[in-house]
Amino acid sequence: ECSKKTKTDDQDDLSVDAPSPAQENGEKGEFHKLADAKIFLSDCLACDSCVTAEEGVQLSQQNAKDFFRVLNLNKKCDTSKHKVLVVSVCPQSLPYFAAKFNLSVTEASRRLCGSLKSLGVHFVFDTTIAADFSILESQKEFVRRYRQHSEEERTLPMLTSACPGWVRYAERVLGRPITAHLCTAKSPQQVMGSLVKDYFARQQNLSPEKIFHVIVAPCYDKKLEALQEGSLSALHGSRGTDCVLTSGEIAQIMEQGDLSVKDAAIDTLFGDLREDKVTRHDGAGSDGHLAHIFRHAAKELFNEDVEEVTYRALRNKDFQEVTLEKDGEVVLRFAAACGFRNIQNMILKLKKGKFPYHFVEVLACAGGCLNGRGQAQTPEGHADKALLRQMEGIYADIPVRRPESSAHVQELYQEWLEGINSPKAREVLHTTYQSQERGAHSLDIKW
């Protein structure tokens, strides 16, 4: 039975009546019966009760103990069992460390890298390069969908797929009518897994299973995403990400260690090069798919150069709109929907055919990825709004880079993926979605 959460601090969530679905075959249903209870939609999505027993065991193993298990294994003399330990850090985690330790974001990245290497981590990467690929592939897919869209073939709106909580909810509850709109480009975490376990492994002459890959992320849903990452044939059955630790979990490890360790620059996938400067994509608290796809679509479809993307808040600050007008007509209408009240309204209108948007960046957390529950919470488990405001200010000051400007990404398309739009690029950078049949196994939420 669903262990319904009872958090009440998120005022942006709307509670809904949830009828009790039947269960079959004695297995855990995708969303267990809720005994006509009132639930928060965010709790429904973030709750771990819909995971299978096997997933539950695997999730429980993704913690600091698992991390230290590998570190300690590497200290033993049986070198055949040693692992190359790689940690990849999401850019939305860095403002948390900067705020936590009262450092600039560059200093925080160096402190984090130095601390991890002092423990025995071999390489520390930034996942921004993986987000480059995710955004570039999403840009191409949106343009294709826009050109193909018609009354007979409704390929729009395209909904982003970088947020694992939202994607799992779409797959498990909403089903095919909604998952057909999900962008097929893999999330930055999934791309990073392939970069580390495929490209980097070959550069180091290692088999994928010899690498233990840890992602540092702002939210707990990334742990579940790691379990669901499809294994590429090139990875020989190995998952791209072995363990996800939240920013808060890593901060605890740092606080328990020696804070006087020597700082170190973030590594890159390119030999001895180091990341001297922290950069991000153009998103208020996320990977910035909306802004980059909007600019690309404006240029590609309408030959319009958009330098500044102007957001307009509509019903609340977590639902914002961006439009492009040409000859007095709106030709592009994008939106960012954060938090479950806005997701709820979006799905309702989409099902009624009254949703006028071409593209929506969908994020489970109100305020975006910076507000992930793995970092923007008080010790008591409440939302830390003061910390969130501080992180937003820090994140806004990080220099923005456009994915098209990365020479390394273009190099990787050729060297690693055998060219842009190649069969290997499609296999490595795109995914498919598993949709449950609406019925006994779904939580039939009344929108």
Predicted segments — roles?
Residues 1-447:
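Iron-sulfur-associated redox domains of electron-transfer enzymes in respiratory
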